[in-house]
Amino acid sequence: MTNSLKWLVLASVTNLVGNVLGTILALQHNLTGDFGGWLNGQNILRDFLTFKGTALSAPLPFLLIELGLTILALRPGRSGRIGVGGLLFVGALYTIAQLGEPIVFRVWSPSGFDPAQAVVLFVNVASAIAMLVLGIRTWRTMRASAPLTG
């Protein structure tokens, strides 16, 4: 296992933990997802269990997909490449999704600052960016070491 793959898996696990903590905070504080102002979540638990997510977490189906991709990334060969490519994509998607939430501006404003929400938001965004960057590095390493066929 390469160093970049180890770091990618660590970033993914960190992201999963951050999303779980984000879900707990969202349920406690009624933080509905409102990506770009057009999701308008109504029921946080239902939104989390389906495909909307919360203001501080991705939806459960996406987290389960991320968990599966993380496990795949640890496997050799084609399965591992699928896992790495998937985590790279998930990192890009989560970065855009989290930064598109209005809570980003509210949490970092003096009047709306909440330390727990700010930490979870930072962990989620930083780990998603890390997944994207480390996914690219790992993908390049895997491609360079793959035997050429043809």
Where are these regions (language model features)?
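Cytosolic juxtamembrane helix and N-cap/initiation of the first transmembrane helix
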Residues: M1-Q28, R137-R143, G150
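Interfacial segments of alpha-helical transmembrane regions
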Residues: N3-V17, R75-G91
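Small-residue packing motifs within transmembrane alpha-helices
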Residues: W7-L8, F62-L64, S79-R81, L87-L88, ...
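Hydrophobic transmembrane helix segments
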Residues: T14-L60
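Hydrophobic alpha-helical transmembrane segments of integral membrane proteins
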Residues: G85-A118
